[in-house]
Amino acid sequence: MATREQAILSSSMQQPPPLGVPRPLRVVVVDDSPDFLEVICGLLRLEDSIEIVGYGTDGTQAIRVVADLHPDLLLMDVQMPYMSGSAATLIISQHFPTVNVVLMSSDDSLQTRIACKSAGAQALIYKPAFRKQFFEVLEKIYCGAGAQATVDQNESSRTQP
């Protein structure tokens, strides 16, 4: 029987796809609202270029899932019980710097934007505008526009509910 460490190690040593064949973006989704989690995952499953590899409902679970699965992207709510998304982002960005973190919030205050940026998030998506902003954010992150521009631009592209 394999130990937990062996299982984690073997799962992280998967063969890369053949050269020239892009692999799907491996995404972990974390939100304390089961309804919103279901909606977001439903939208993401429509995309062939995205593979949801894990879920969580609070910041502590986000850290554990990222440590176990090493996703390309962590999509996480800001306000959650036990540990906020911004607190989890600070830890994840220090220990797993290759994981891009995109935070989501219904709170579009300056304080929330500053907290997300300070924690190391690549972007903050305003939840009521998720559908519009998500793919714009992905393009900016993975096409090299940079985190600063992504977090700042979302302030001007938010739509009011």
Task: Locate predicted features.
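Conserved acidic segment of CheY-like receiver
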Residues: 23-36, 40-44
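Non-catalytic signal-transmission and effector/linker regions of two-component phosphorelay proteins
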Residues: 1-26, 132-161
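Receiver (REC) domain active-site loop signature in two-component systems and cognate sites
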Residues: 80
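Alpha4 helix (beta4-alpha4-beta5 surface) of REC/receiver domains from two-component response regulators
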Residues: 87, 108-125, 132-136, 140
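Acidic catalytic/metal-coordinating carboxylates
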Residues: 58-61, 83-87
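Active-site beta3 strand of CheY-like receiver
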Residues: 69-75
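Short amphipathic alpha-helix used as the core "switch/output" element in two-component signaling
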Residues: 64, 86-97
